[in-house]
Amino acid sequence: MDRVFLLLSVLSLGVSSQPITDSQRLFSIAVSRVQHLHLLAQRLFSDFESSLQTEEQRQLNKIFLQDFCNSDYIISPIDKHETQRSSVLKLLSISYRLVESWEFPSRSLSGGSAPRNQISPKLSELKTGIHLLIRANQDGDEMFADSSALQLAPYGNYYQSLGADESLRRSYELLACFKKDMHKVETYLTVAKCRLSPEANCTL
């Protein structure tokens, strides 16, 4: 982790002299980080689902499809076409807010295993990297708005004392939303990174 922060610091110092090269390197680190988090989210969700009875899975999936994730309050592209039309800075800004929205909820995902305990620190590393990318890709026409004032509603009553059935639902919801959001961030960062390679085909 120290090596990652050192590299991020070095790259941030060189942004003004070699913006394209530095952005490429930062993007590679960020994409690698979010890919790891997305795979981890998929595994945690799969493990949780496998511990449920078939009827429990069916009911929870039905409820989740009718519910909303906390991050749905963050405006993002509605489909792959809008994603491809979005600017690099817009994709980075949305990714930053999505990652930031998990800083507190991720604590409830930690504990019990080494992979779970990696979630919060890796989210913090990813947020730092995306912030450096935003700084490197800002221009006078398009500026990143600070999201520090952005307040999202909590995940229902997830943090309260719940009955067994409700606790099961909240755990399912949290893991499903985390997987969904990490998939979004991976998609946005991958498309944004591709934009820096004019010869590349960025079709989703």
UniProtKB/Swiss-Prot annotation:
Q: Name one Pfam family in it.
A: Hormone_1
Keyword Signal recorded: yes
Print the keywords alphabetically. Disulfide bond, Hormone, Metal-binding, Pyrrolidone carboxylic acid, Secreted, Signal, Zinc
GO BP term, pick one:
positive regulation of growth
Question: Which residues does the record give as Zn(2+) binding sites?
Answer: H36, E186
**Signal sequence interval, chain numbering:** 1-17
Q: Which CDD domains match?
A: somatotropin_like
Membrane spanning segments where?
A: none
Modified positions (Pyrrolidone carboxylic acid) are Q18
Q: Which cysteine residues pair off into disulfide bonds?
A: C69-C177, C194-C202
A single Gene Ontology MF term assigned here is: growth hormone activity
Q: Where in the cell is it found?
A: Secreted
**One Gene Ontology CC term in the entry:** extracellular space
The record's comment on protein family reads: Belongs to the somatotropin/prolactin family.
Q: What does this protein do?
A: Growth hormone plays an important role in growth control and is involved in the regulation of several anabolic processes. Implicated as an osmoregulatory substance important for seawater adaptation.
PANTHER family attached to this UniProt entry: SOMATOTROPIN, SOMATOTROPIN,PROLACTIN
Q: What is this protein called?
A: Somatotropin
Q: What is the lineage of its organism?
A: Eukaryota, Metazoa, Chordata, Craniata, Vertebrata
Source gene?
gh
